[in-house]
Each structure stands twice: as C-alpha cells, then as structure tokens.
C-alpha cells in the first residue's frame, strides 16, 4: 500500500495530499507548505484504488537521526488505521535507510496517537504556522 516516491507523479501526489490537509483544512499558507527540504527528503505515499490517500517524508538530520515530517492522511481515510499503517511504513523506511532515532514536530492534537506508537514528548509546546506543536522522539529498533 505504501511506496517510496521514485518519480515526479508520485511526488505531485504527495503535494496534492499535503495541500488538501495542511493548506485547505488547516489554513497553512500554501507558500510555506512546500519547502527547501523537499529534494533532500525521502517521501512515502499510500494509494487506495489508485487514489493518493496518505503521505509523509523523512529527512536525515545526521548519520543516526531522521526527522519525520508532513504526515498527512486524507479526511476520507481517517479513523481506519491508515495513520498507524503510514507511520509503521515510515519507521520501516527509516530503519531500512540506516537510521536509529526518529524525531518529529507533532501537532498537539495528535500527541495521543504518536504516544500510542511509543513516541515521547520532548521540550515545550511551540507554534508553527499558527498550530501548536511539540517535539516527539522515538528510538527505532527491531522490536517496534
């Protein structure tokens, strides 16, 4: 269901999901949504019957740590375990790429979801594009 993005069409599908979720639903400015890290990130996309429904990207921070970013599931596919499957695929990809630690700036409304995946909060709540976030981290091991 989830694939590592390997062509422009797949990347455009990621951007489509992100625009729907972050720009249209959450009011993030469109010019902020696509950033300078796109080319150095590894993108993941999920399709359902050929339609793009979920995406995330990982960005190397150093030799051992990856930052999980732009996690988005289309509204039509929420509440069905899609986010959990997406995060499992993201973690698997990060481990396959040789990373041992994952970090992310999670939207505060999603803290319980990420805690259920064994992410731990670190630091204080901060605003990013007017939305409350908190840093969360997880050690990536074969026991996930």
Swiss-Prot record:
<keyword id="KW-0808">Transferase</keyword>
<keyword id="KW-0012">Acyltransferase</keyword>
<protein>
    <recommendedName>
        <fullName>Acetyltransferase SACOL1063</fullName>
        <ecNumber>2.3.1.-</ecNumber>
    </recommendedName>
</protein>
<dbReference type="GO" id="GO:0004343">
    <property type="term" value="F:glucosamine 6-phosphate N-acetyltransferase activity"/>
</dbReference>
<feature type="binding site">
    <location>
        <begin position="112"/>
        <end position="114"/>
    </location>
    <ligand>
        <name>CoA</name>
    </ligand>
</feature>
<dbReference type="Pfam" id="PF00583">
    <property type="entry name" value="Acetyltransf_1"/>
</dbReference>
<feature type="binding site">
    <location>
        <begin position="71"/>
        <end position="73"/>
    </location>
    <ligand>
        <name>CoA</name>
    </ligand>
</feature>
<dbReference type="GO" id="GO:0016747">
    <property type="term" value="F:acyltransferase activity, transferring groups other than amino-acyl groups"/>
</dbReference>
<dbReference type="InterPro" id="IPR016181">
    <property type="entry name" value="Acyl_CoA_acyltransferase"/>
</dbReference>
<comment type="similarity">
    <text>Belongs to the UPF0039 (ElaA) family.</text>
</comment>
<dbReference type="InterPro" id="IPR039143">
    <property type="entry name" value="GNPNAT1-like"/>
</dbReference>
<comment type="function">
    <text>Catalyzes the transfer of an acetyl group from acetyl coenzyme A (AcCoA) to an acceptor substrate and releases both CoA and the acetylated product. It displays the highest activity for L-threonine. It can also use L-tryptophan, and to a much lesser extent L-tyrosine.</text>
</comment>
<feature type="domain" description="N-acetyltransferase">
    <location>
        <begin position="1"/>
        <end position="141"/>
    </location>
</feature>
<feature type="binding site">
    <location>
        <position position="79"/>
    </location>
    <ligand>
        <name>CoA</name>
    </ligand>
</feature>
<dbReference type="InterPro" id="IPR000182">
    <property type="entry name" value="GNAT_dom"/>
</dbReference>
């Amino acid at each position: 269901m989830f694939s590592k993005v390997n062509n422009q069409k797949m990347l455009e599908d990621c951007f489509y999901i992100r625009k729907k979720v972050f720009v249209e639903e959450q009011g993030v400015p469109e010019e902020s949504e696509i950033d300078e890290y796109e080319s150095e990130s590894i993108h993941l996309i999920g399709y359902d019957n050929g339609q793009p429904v979920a995406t995330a990207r990982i960005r190397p921070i150093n030799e051992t740590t990856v930052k999980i970013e732009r996690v988005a599931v289309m509204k039509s596919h929420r509440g069905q375990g899609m986010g959990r499957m997406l995060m499992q695929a993201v973690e698997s990809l990060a481990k396959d790429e040789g990373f041992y630690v994952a970090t992310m700036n999670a939207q505060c409304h999603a803290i319980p979801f990420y805690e259920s995946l064994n992410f731990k909060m670190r630091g204080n709540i901060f605003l990013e594009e007017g939305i409350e976030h908190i840093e969360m981290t997880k050690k990536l091991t074969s026991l996930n």
